[in-house]
């Protein structure tokens, strides 16, 4: 009965299956945690969604920014970009079933017994766990409702970038979405910076990676996240696990077995595409 945490899959279906075979994942007894961004850029987004959905209660996932963008494309709000390679999914006979399932997935996973929290981009140091749970539920409720296209149309944007319990309406939902799915850097007070994509050693002062600023959640729980492929799983404090290692860019797909903290990797089937260097931070 093992728990396996895997970073951003981004449509890399073959690598996902190979990695699960490598660790001898057994859905009947094991649990798979996925950090989000199941889709886009890799060639197999349709197969990834079909497989993950088929796992039922054996999988715990969170939504990433690319998953939300897919939902916006599906709703007719955003443009289907060829580089995302989503057309086979959008044109599949079971697209409605898959994407209506996807929009009902959470932004946050918490295991109190393991003292483990997972979100796609991480947990802002401005939140305690109760606030994070409440905020996740706010967005999840809208996404699972019939009014979800209205939210998806309004979610794009970098402001507001500072948390306040007084935030309301679409501004509140946009901050929550950015914190859970797009965050990388914060100012020392925890305010989000949504612009810098430099590596931590080159980030302009006074910005720090969100995980370098102490917060109530990181002080009491381990946090697993994806999103930030250029970290390559390195440079985080103890108890913070960066699992996106750029499989869709020619890197690797990374798995952490929680019980003994052993890592497993599956090299990407893609050659490193230097032309997409900026997009590694997307």
Swiss-Prot record:
InterPro entries: ApaH, Calcineurin-like_PHP_ApaH, Metallo-depent_PP-like
Reaction(s) the record says it catalyses: P(1),P(4)-bis(5'-adenosyl) tetraphosphate + H2O = 2 ADP + 2 H(+)
Keywords: Hydrolase
UniProt GO MF annotations: bis(5'-nucleosyl)-tetraphosphatase (symmetrical) activity
EC number(s) on file: 3.6.1.41
Signal peptide: none
Gene3D superfamilies: 3.60.21.10
SUPFAM superfamilies (alphabetical): Metallo-dependent phosphatases (SSF56300)
CDD domains: MPP_ApaH (cd07422)
Pfam families per record: Metallophos (PF00149)
Domain of life of the native organism: Bacteria
Protein's job: Hydrolyzes diadenosine 5',5'''-P1,P4-tetraphosphate to yield ADP.
HAMAP family assigned to the protein according to its UniProt record, in alphabetical order: ApaH
Homology family: Belongs to the Ap4A hydrolase family.
UniProt protein name: Bis(5'-nucleosyl)-tetraphosphatase, symmetrical
UniProt organism field: Salmonella arizonae (strain ATCC BAA-731 / CDC346-86 / RSK2980)
Taxonomy of the source species: Bacteria, Pseudomonadati, Pseudomonadota, Gammaproteobacteria, Enterobacterales
Name of the gene: apaH
């Amino acid at each position: 009965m093992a728990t396996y945490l895997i970073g951003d899959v981004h449509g890399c279906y073959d690598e996902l299956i190979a990695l699960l075979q490598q660790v001898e994942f057994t859905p009947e007894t094991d649990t798979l945690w996925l950090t989000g961004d199941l889709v886009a850029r890799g060639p197999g987004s349709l197969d990834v969604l079909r497989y993950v959905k088929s796992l039922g209660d054996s999988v715990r996932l969170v939504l990433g920014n690319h998953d939300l963008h897919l939902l916006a494309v599906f709703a007719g709000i955003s443009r289907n970009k060829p580089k995302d390679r989503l057309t086979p999914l959008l044109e599949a006979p079971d697209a409605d079933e898959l994407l209506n399932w996807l929009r009902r997935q959470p932004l946050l996973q918490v295991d109190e017994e393991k003292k483990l929290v997972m979100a796609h981009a991480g947990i802002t140091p401005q939140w305690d766990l109760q606030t994070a749970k409440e905020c996740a539920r706010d967005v999840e409720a809208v996404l699972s409702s019939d009014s979800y296209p209205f939210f998806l149309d309004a979610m794009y944007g970098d402001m507001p970038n500072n948390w306040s319990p007084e935030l309301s309406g679409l501004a509140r939902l946009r901050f929550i979405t950015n914190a859970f799915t797009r965050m990388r850097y914060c100012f020392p007070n925890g305010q989000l910076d949504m612009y810098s994509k430099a590596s931590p050693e080159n980030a302009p002062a006074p910005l720090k990676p969100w995980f370098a600023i102490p917060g109530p959640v990181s002080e009491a729980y381990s946090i697993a996240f994806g999103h930030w492929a250029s970290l390559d799983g390195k440079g985080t404090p103890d108890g913070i696990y960066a699992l996106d290692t750029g499989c869709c860019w020619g890197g690797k797909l990374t798995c952490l077995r929680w019980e003994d903290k052993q890592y497993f990797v599956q090299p990407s089937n893609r050659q490193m595409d230097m032309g997409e260097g900026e997009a590694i931070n997307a």
